[in-house]
């Protein structure tokens, strides 16, 4: 008799505490919450937005992955999900294992299980056409997943606020201190040998906006270390076999103007598997800021850009 060795499961869940005021569906759409168990047992909170009166088999669903320390309510995920669920699309937004206070503690390779659980859940709910969207740190997680899983149900990829080459950026733009970088790299390797890769290092890492943040060895090695990290969008993007949309706000103070072009160059290089890619830069005359990175004052232009591109892809 066959036995179940591992499984992905989902069930209805109560809404998380402290939801933003606009975490309400527009007329003609609905919002409910799920608890999803990944194959390794990790519990994922998820928000399912969908148009009313249309069977899932006739709807394209956007599986959304947030950025560093975000969650299922983060911008720009919720504004895209809210707006497009009133235009005939569904969205499944997840809180991945590096959400909120767990930022900079995860292993890059483990987040794949969160995305896998969301994709499998979407298919179990009846959806047959999936778009994978990643924002900020979620862009390289999404790119890795799609590049390494040619699931025909996944039809396209949307990357908002996408970094170019995160290990290089971490060392030379964020940390900007070779002595500190080498100390983090050495301490992380020593912790790995000692079996304590999940424990926070005694050395903090210089991060976004110059903030000194706690970090685990497994996070540093798999995301930030130039030799060991796999969080390199320029490596994964040419291995994606689906159409790709990249969107950046002109006022983005986190992703630098040249970074999307690193991804474009990689996607268009000789031998790339990418069938088509488009880069949309949304005009914004405000000074560069963290708010620009999350499209805080450009939400309508963002949702229009995504909806227009999806329509062109006949999705």
Where are these regions (language model features)?
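N-terminal cap/lid segment of alpha/beta-hydrolase-fold proteins
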Residues: 4-55
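Residue-level signal for short, function-critical loop segments
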Residues: 67-68, 136, 250-251
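Catalytic nucleophile-loop/oxyanion-hole region of alpha/beta-hydrolase
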Residues: 72, 97-131, 296-297
């Amino acid at each position: 008799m066959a036995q179940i060795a591992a499984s992905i499961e989902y069930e209805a869940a109560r809404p998380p505490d402290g939801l933003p005021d606009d975490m309400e569906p527009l007329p003609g759409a609905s919002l409910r919450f799920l608890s999803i168990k990944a194959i390794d047992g990790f519990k994922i909170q998820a928000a399912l937005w969908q148009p009313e009166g249309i069977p899932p088999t006739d709807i394209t669903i956007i599986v959304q992955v947030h950025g560093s320390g975000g969650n299922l309510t983060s911008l720009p995920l919720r504004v895209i999900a809210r707006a497009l669920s009133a235009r005939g699309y569904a969205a499944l937004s997840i809180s991945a294992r590096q959400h909120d206070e767990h930022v900079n503690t995860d292993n890059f390779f483990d987040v794949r299980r969160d995305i896998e659980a969301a994709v499998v859940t979407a298919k179990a709910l009846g959806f047959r056409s999936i778009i994978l969207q990643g924002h900020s740190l979620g862009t390289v997680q999404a790119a890795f997943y799609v590049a390494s899983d040619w699931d025909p149900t996944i039809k396209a990829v949307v990357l908002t606020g996408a970094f170019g080459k995160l290990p290089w950026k971490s060392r030379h733009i964020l940390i900007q201190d070779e002595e500190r970088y080498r100390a983090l790299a050495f301490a992380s390797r020593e912790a790995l040998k000692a079996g304590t890769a999940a424990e926070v290092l005694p050395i903090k890492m210089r991060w976004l906006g110059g903030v000194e943040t706690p970090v685990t060895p497994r996070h540093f090695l798999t995301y930030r270390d130039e030799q060991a990290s796999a969080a390199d969008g320029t490596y994964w993007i040419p291995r994606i076999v689906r159409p790709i949309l990249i969107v950046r706000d002109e006022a983005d103070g986190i992703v630098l103007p040249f970074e999307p072009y690193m991804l474009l160059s990689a996607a268009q290089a000789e031998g790339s598997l990418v069938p088509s890619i488009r880069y949309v830069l949304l005009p914004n005359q405000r000074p560069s800021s963290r708010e620009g990175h999350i499209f805080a004052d450009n939400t309508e232009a963002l949702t229009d850009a995504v909806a227009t591109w999806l329509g062109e892809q006949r999705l």
